[in-house]
Amino acid sequence: MSDLQNQMKQAVADAAVQQFRDGMVVGLGSGSTAALMIKGLGERLAAGQLSDIVGVTTSFQGEVLAAELGIPLRSLNAVDRIDLAIDGADEVDPAFQLIKGGGACHVQEKLVAARADRFIVVVDSTKLVERLNLGFLLPVEVLPGAWVQISQQLKAMGGDAELRMATRKAGPVVTDQGNLVLDVRFEGGIADPASLEKEINNIPGVLENGLFVNLADEVLVGQIDGGVASARSLEKAG
């Protein structure tokens, strides 16, 4: 990752932290940009700049980080509502449709985003695309005993699926739910995210896929302008 990209991530994470208010129940996302945001939230709480915040995390990694920083946490089942969720994305199209799941946390991420009154996505400018899936593969979480069958069904739908393998251990990536992840590429990208999200989730054995359709209320983008990193709110197409 380049130094410029790191600067963009930090700028947008700093902007995200400014969205939190006293007394909020907040969804804390996963990934590198979200981790910077969680650190910023912890710093503001420690400095007394925020109070009465309760966090709901979307991954084990985020839970550990938030706990280390002293952020009070509750499970999704223990809260009636989430005031604001902030998370990253792997790709964002002009209509604010997303691909998420590079960290294999998209099931919990989607649960938190759907529960939130407001969902803000934070990305650097490299994550903005005209069409989803031309660059980043679509993650699909599947039951371990059905991944071959599901791969075949995805192929019949025009998708080329491969089982995600772990890099620090032998064998496949295993999600927090104990499932496997198929990474899928559709020729020409994904023209209709809303239809495809439903079609994939209707395959028996699929728990959830990484298409986030009509969930994002705002997208904050980190950018470099004149050598200086800053964040801006993206204008939604249409």
UniProtKB/Swiss-Prot annotation:
SUPFAM superfamilies documented for this protein: D-ribose-5-phosphate isomerase (RpiA), lid domain, NagB/RpiA/CoA transferase-like
Q: Which HAMAP family does the UniProt record give? A: Rib_5P_isom_A
- Keywords for this protein: Isomerase
Q: Which GO terms of type biological process are on file?
A: D-ribose metabolic process; pentose-phosphate shunt, non-oxidative branch
The protein here is known as Ribose-5-phosphate isomerase A
InterPro entries annotated for this entry? NagB/RpiA_transferase-like, Ribose5P_isomerase_typA_subgr, Ribose5P_isomerase_type_A
- Give the catalysed reaction(s), semicolon-separated: aldehydo-D-ribose 5-phosphate = D-ribulose 5-phosphate
Its top-level enzyme class, in one word, is isomerase
Give the GO molecular function terms: ribose-5-phosphate isomerase activity
**Organism encoding this protein:** Synechococcus sp. (strain WH7803)
UniProt similarity note: Belongs to the ribose 5-phosphate isomerase family.
Indicate the quaternary assembly: Homodimer.
EC number(s) given by UniProt: 5.3.1.6
Residues of the active site are 109
This protein's GO cellular component annotations are: cytosol
Q: Which domain of life is it from?
A: Bacteria
* Coiled coil region boundaries: none
Q: In which pathway does it act?
A: Carbohydrate degradation; pentose phosphate pathway; D-ribose 5-phosphate from D-ribulose 5-phosphate (non-oxidative stage): step 1/1
Give me the segments passing through the membrane. Answer: none
